[in-house]
């Protein structure tokens, strides 16, 4: 399907020169003089090579037809990550290149969205928030509960983040998967 370049967003899949690219970032630039352009950074799905392209905002770009489905994460082995379709119980293996940094947040039985083109998995979308346990942080300081300062912490998946002073080791917290930031204390 052909669309204008200015409508391309992060996560879209573009077909160019017979190859598929997933959009890493897309920005529309309107200079004071001259024609507005769309600056698009893409990662080639087949081998992970990153490229950057500039299009006039009115140029036509071939947007690939992508099918999104919910899958359940099962396990990881040396070959990649294994997911199951909860409706058909079909299993699919996804390479480490496609999963990328999202691997740190994957937990058994977690539901994720896998985007496929033909039969190939091209991208993975995590839930917005995950619950993790704090495994290392400074001790709780009495009297600092209303402070807006944060202290460093290491989570059960190895990610480093900052948490409020009242959070102690062993506390389960909700973390945003997009940037690894603290959201709230878990309610479970």
UniProtKB/Swiss-Prot annotation:
GO terms for biological process: peptide biosynthetic process. The gene is efp. Pathway: Protein biosynthesis; polypeptide chain elongation. GO terms for molecular function: translation elongation factor activity. Keywords: Cytoplasm, Elongation factor, Protein biosynthesis. Belongs to the elongation factor P family. Pfam families: EFP, EFP_N, Elong-fact-P_C. This is Elongation factor P. InterPro entries: Elong-fact-P_C, NA-bd_OB-fold, Rib_uL2_dom2, Transl_elong_fac_P/YeiP, Transl_elong_KOW-like, Transl_elong_P/YeiP_cen, Transl_elong_P/YeiP_CS, Transl_elongation_fac_P. Involved in peptide bond synthesis. Stimulates efficient translation and peptide-bond synthesis on native or reconstituted 70S ribosomes in vitro. Probably functions indirectly by altering the affinity of the ribosome for aminoacyl-tRNA, thus increasing their reactivity as acceptors for peptidyl transferase. GO terms for cellular component: cytoplasm. Gene3D superfamilies: 2.30.30.30, Nucleic acid-binding proteins. It is found in: Cytoplasm.
């Amino acid at each position: 399907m052909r669309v204008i370049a200015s409508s391309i967003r992060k996560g879209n899949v573009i077909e160019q020169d017979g190859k598929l690219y997933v959009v890493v970032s897309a920005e529309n630039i309107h200079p004071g003089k001259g024609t507005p352009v769309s600056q698009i950074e893409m990662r080639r799905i087949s081998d992970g090579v990153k490229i950057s392209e500039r299009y006039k905002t009115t140029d036509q770009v071939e947007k690939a037809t992508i099918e999104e489905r919910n899958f359940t994460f099962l396990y990881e082995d040396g070959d990649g990550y294994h997911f199951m379709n909860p409706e058909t119980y079909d299993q699919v293996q996804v390479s480490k290149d496609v999963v990328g940094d999202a691997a740190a947040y994957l937990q058994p039985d977690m539901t994720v969205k896998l985007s496929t083109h033909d039969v190939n998995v091209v991208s993975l979308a995590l839930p917005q928030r995950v619950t993790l346990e704090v495994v290392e942080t400074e001790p709780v300081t009495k009297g600092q509960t209303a402070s807006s300062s944060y202290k460093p912490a290491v989570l059960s998946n190895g990610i480093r983040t900052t948490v409020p002073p009242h959070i102690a080791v062993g506390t389960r917290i909700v973390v945003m998967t997009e940037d690894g930031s603290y959201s709230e204390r878990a309610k479970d």
